[in-house]
């Protein structure tokens, strides 16, 4: 068992989640800004 390998895998999962979530977050932020006027 290699803790560094496990950490690397977890980091990649987190990065993938952030990358896939970023556009949605930006869209929601834009919509909120437009709604506020």
Swiss-Prot record:
<keyword id="KW-0964">Secreted</keyword>
<keyword id="KW-0399">Innate immunity</keyword>
<dbReference type="GO" id="GO:0045087">
    <property type="term" value="P:innate immune response"/>
</dbReference>
<dbReference type="Pfam" id="PF00272">
    <property type="entry name" value="Cecropin"/>
</dbReference>
<keyword id="KW-0391">Immunity</keyword>
<keyword id="KW-0929">Antimicrobial</keyword>
<dbReference type="InterPro" id="IPR000875">
    <property type="entry name" value="Cecropin"/>
</dbReference>
<dbReference type="GO" id="GO:0005576">
    <property type="term" value="C:extracellular region"/>
</dbReference>
<comment type="function">
    <text>Cecropins have lytic and antibacterial activity against several Gram-positive and Gram-negative bacteria.</text>
</comment>
<feature type="modified residue" description="Glycine amide">
    <location>
        <position position="37"/>
    </location>
</feature>
<keyword id="KW-0027">Amidation</keyword>
<dbReference type="GO" id="GO:0050830">
    <property type="term" value="P:defense response to Gram-positive bacterium"/>
</dbReference>
<comment type="similarity">
    <text>Belongs to the cecropin family.</text>
</comment>
<protein>
    <recommendedName>
        <fullName>Bactericidin B-2</fullName>
    </recommendedName>
</protein>
<dbReference type="GO" id="GO:0019731">
    <property type="term" value="P:antibacterial humoral response"/>
</dbReference>
<keyword id="KW-0044">Antibiotic</keyword>
């Amino acid at each position: 068992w290699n803790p560094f390998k496990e950490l690397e895998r977890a980091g990649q999962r987190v990065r993938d989640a952030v990358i896939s979530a970023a556009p949605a977050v930006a869209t929601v932020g834009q919509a909120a800004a437009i709604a506020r006027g």
